[in-house]
UniProtKB/Swiss-Prot annotation:
Family, per entry: Belongs to the type III pantothenate kinase family.
Protein name: Type III pantothenate kinase
An example molecular function term from Gene Ontology annotations: pantothenate kinase activity
Subunit structure comment from the entry: Homodimer.
Gene from which this protein is expressed: coaX
Species assigned in the record: Nitrosomonas europaea (strain ATCC 19718 / CIP 103999 / KCTC 2705 / NBRC 14298)
Length: 256
């Protein structure tokens, strides 16, 4: 195997770490581990061939970053950390402070733009749910952040005096018990945020242009049946974006 093009892409989110080994054409291996169990990654990564490059999108804080550095140290490969910027890989940021945008959101936007090349929403349903808008010319127009499914249900259970209710239920248009009321309210709130942003982006781009929506993150499958707009689920959107960024960096000659 030619290892000179091997990339280890790592998506270090608030709840879990996703990773994949890519050879420039396809994924050779991939996995997912909870942040609380991230030291188990040593077993997964020891079995891999040494990558030529490592690119990480980390939003889980300094301790997670330090642990990743220690886990990856045996390969003696320089670690690259994804950061948001004003312009990259065809996407232009309108964020008031581009560097302040979460690197996972930025990388996901790059992946979505390369997939669709059209106006779209990028919805990442995780610990928090982000709903970000891309214009038809690849401009990141802005986005919203709301609590994700688990955070929303837990907050209601903890603070609404419903301590004995399990965090479960089923969706009903008109719920007739407390468990279903909690669950259905969570679904309505999250899908409402997505569909409101969809309407705003459709208005911005012009009603004649179809806006696509990409759902990603651990809660994407939970929301998908309840979203009544054009959409698709992409499981590893951030990892895709890391591959695109790494490929673009490889095309730029090194300077001293």
């Amino acid at each position: 195997m030619n290892t000179s093009s091997l990339l280890l892409a790592v998506d270090s989110g608030n709840t879990a770490i996703k990773w994949g080994l890519h050879d420039g054409r396809q994924w050779l291996a991939h996995g997912k581990t909870l942040q609380s169990e991230r030291r188990m990654l040593k077993q997964n990564w020891t079995a891999l061939p040494a990558p030529a490059s490592i690119l990480i999108a980390n939003v889980a804080g300094l301790q997670a970053a330090d642990d990743l550095k220690a886990l990856l140290a045996p390969w003696h490969v320089h670690l690259e950390w994804a950061t948001a910027s004003a312009r990259q890989c065809g996407v232009i940021s309108r964020y008031s402070n581009p560097a302040q945008l979460g690197c996972d959101r930025w990388v996901a936007l790059i992946a979505a733009w390369h997939r669709l090349q059209q106006a779209c929403l990028v919805v990442d349903v995780g610990t928090a749910m982000t709903v970000d808008a891309l214009s038809a010319s690849g401009e990141f127009l802005g986005g919203v952040i709301v609590p994700g499914p688990d955070a929303m249900r837990q907050a209601l259970a903890d603070r609404a005096g419903i301590f004995s209710m399990p965090l479960s239920g089923s969706f009903q248009n008109f719920p007739i018990n407390t468990g279903n009321a909690l669950y259905s309210g969570m679904i309505q709130a999250l899908t409402g945020a997505v569909e409101r942003m969809y309407d705003q982006l459709s208005e911005y781009t012009g009603k004649q242009m179809v806006v696509e929506t990409i759902l990603t993150g651990g809660g994407a499958a939970l929301l998908a049946p309840h979203i009544h707009i054009p959409h698709q689920i992409v499981d590893d959107l951030v990892l895709e974006g890391l591959v695109i960024i790494a490929g673009a960096q490889a095309e730029i000659p090194a300077t001293r």
